[in-house]
Amino acid sequence: MDKKNRPIGFFDSGVGGLSVMKEAIRLMPNENYIYFGDSKNAPYGIKTVEEVRTLTFNAVESLLEKNVKAIVVACNTATSAAIDLVRSKYKNIPIIGIEPALKLATKYNRKGNIIIMATPMTLKEKKFKSLMEKYGENYDIVSLPCAKLVEFIEHGILSGEELEEYLKEKFKSYKNNDIGVVVLGCTHYPFIKETLYKVIDKDIPIIDGGLGTSQELRRRLEEKNLLNTEDKKGSITIINSNGSEKMIELSKKLIESS
């Protein structure tokens, strides 16, 4: 197979990375995609760094066995814990990670706090701390750990009273005029954006790193002359460690959602 026609591998602790892959599909519809969701071991955000590193290397190995031409670690927690180690081990393949879209958030120039919703591990790791050092002096940045949110989404709960109550509890300390921008620092979270807008004002920007990551993926593929040149819609393959048809169905539903 021509190297350009080989698939792009995406990996996440569960279904969250599909929010990033959707952006990549919009940007490069003729590419072939393989998605590996590790729902059996979700959520990653409450595990130890060593556990997350082991799971990340396992996922990368399984994608390499599928002959992928690039890998997107579409998981903020795995990026925080393992991306540097993964890149140093696999030097011959583009490996793209994801970070909270803090740089983008600062460009909105709105009064109020920049609130970053993320898993506890993402907020503790050095990658996030270096982002805070870069932007923390000039902007009011608030970390909001949301440990349980991934579990809602992994169970297909994207709306409803229980989720709304959880989000209300998280935001109870902030009035709408206290909030400048909300940054979704976990790839699962874009799927509950509409429910979040029932809790905060609709004029508050909610942003994530999905598009920026997909643009970086395209740039890296172009740089390596790996962009697919075929003029037809590419294929999408979904694999989940959970092994259940239910997770595959949920994944398909999330890809097809607007």
UniProtKB/Swiss-Prot annotation:
Cysteine disulfide partners in this protein: none
Alphabetical keyword list: Cell shape, Cell wall biogenesis/degradation, Isomerase, Peptidoglycan synthesis
Gene3D superfamilies with a match to the protein in the record: 3.40.50.1860
GO BP of this protein: cell wall organization; peptidoglycan biosynthetic process; regulation of cell shape
Signal peptide: none
Isomerase as UniProt keyword: yes
Residue numbers annotated as active site: C75 (proton donor/acceptor), C186 (proton donor/acceptor)
InterPro entries tied to this protein: Asp/Glu/hydantoin_racemase, Asp/Glu_race, Asp/Glu_racemase_AS_1, Asp/Glu_racemase_AS_2, Glu_race
GO MF term (any one): glutamate racemase activity
Pathway: Cell wall biogenesis; peptidoglycan biosynthesis
EC code: 5.1.1.3
Binding site for substrate: D12, S13, Y44, G45, N76, T77, T187, H188
Enzyme class label: isomerase
Catalyzed reaction equations: L-glutamate = D-glutamate
Family per similarity comment: Belongs to the aspartate/glutamate racemases family.
UniProt cross-references to HAMAP family, sorted A to Z: Glu_racemase (MF_00258)
Function summary: Provides the (R)-glutamate required for cell wall biosynthesis.
Protein name: Glutamate racemase
Organism: Clostridium botulinum (strain Alaska E43 / Type E3)
Gene: murI
